[in-house]
């Protein structure tokens, strides 16, 4: 990969300063050579306008098998990237294969199915808030562990018929492990093996005992002679929708609460009714997207960037959503600030084009229910530690917080 006399910017593998690093990358240009963990090079795209363009450009693929020489030479196998680009589902499919797989999964995320979950999301939210209310007044509690994480986890597991108990805890642990971009090949391999064992067991159970859940729907689609997907595509699709279906919502909730508690003037606006909760959700998605960067895409042909470098055929591209969300060239001088009254709410947190996240309406619905309910129950909610002591989830992919200690004062 060549760029005019410039060494690649080395991405922090532990993501200790996601937004500081995003600002530094933006200062280097709309597309910058970067080095990811393991010495993998990719063009980090930080410009909102350029990223939006590339997300719909036919010269950009998500299929490493067809369009990435490093994968074709078997130089990536076993790395932390394996679970991100080594899968065979909508996430890595290109062209006709992507359309086929998206058509199969789309019925699982219709507006009707999402709307049907609303009463259940409300009930789960109420139960979790009741549990929090039993916590000793004024004592710190980790909101991520007790509310932000269990809500979307329970919702997605019920949608897909995932059994209660230890298996759900194991699923959560494995998804967190996949997000770890510091994993060794041995750790990545162990995580992948455990994930597929868990999902294979779920598929076997639904074949034997089909039910009114989305796993059963996908199993039926896979076994239908007219709409076949391979068994590996089925497992990888489940990994995509179950993993993405809860982890991103966990961080959406956490980032929204964190933003409001560190911007009390904004919290006052929404609690007074001057600004709707929908605006809080969209500004959170722009200001602190759950996915800070998402590996990888690949140039199918040379792509000349106006007033910038040329991304050569076969080179990797890293969409940098955290950087694009705060791009001052698109959002103006106040791009780095959290402002729920912002005129321009557009963001790319759920992607764009044919790879736009199918689960976006579900994530928004969960946040629309959970956030006002949380602040209605605990209007005096406050951080239990200084904001600067909050630690990121870890890795450069996730844009969330490892924990969110709060005090649940009622007024």
Region annotations inferred by a language model:
Residues 1-411:
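Cytochrome P450
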